[in-house]
Amino acid sequence: MSEGVRIGSLVHTDHRADVLRMLEEGLAQGGTVVTGGAAVEGDGAFMQPTVVTDVAASNLLFQEELFGPVLAVTKFTEEAEALALANDTPFGLLNGVWTNDLSRAHRFARDLQSGMVSINEYPITFPQTAFTGWKQSGIGIEQSQDALRFYTRVKNVNVKL
């Protein structure tokens, strides 16, 4: 990594073990580790940032939420193919779109089947914005006024005075 880049620990050594196990299972289905792929010795539950290329859309690394520093790279040729690949998963927490064409990015973000989309940046959440997933990535909404609505039931009561 470049000087000054910092990456935090995973939440627990058991979680790191789960991520490493899923990485191993995914690699058995195909793919090439370009960098990383191992635990970092010492305090905490650190893991090397890992990039795996040539990952098929059916691969566990493509289909599951690992919640670890693993990037599975899949090639595509057309925008429609990229959208179909992104939506062909049972999960829909977050998608990232990287492009210089913001009109294209917004069109793509509209059609992605996920609760959150980050364009040209690492995902950032604010208390005023909803944190939500689609499909099997969760039920409900956290943060924002939308979250408050999730826990309320509206009732209209009329009284003649």
What residues fall within each predicted segment?
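Short secondary-structure junctions and interdomain/linker hinges
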Residues: Q29-G30, N158
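Amidase signature
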Residues: M22-L23, G42
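Short beta-strand to alpha-helix junction loop
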Residues: L10-L20
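Short secondary-structure junctions
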Residues: G30-G37
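Conserved C-terminal structural/oligomerization subdomain of aldehyde/semialdehyde dehydrogenase
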Residues: I7, A39, F46-L161
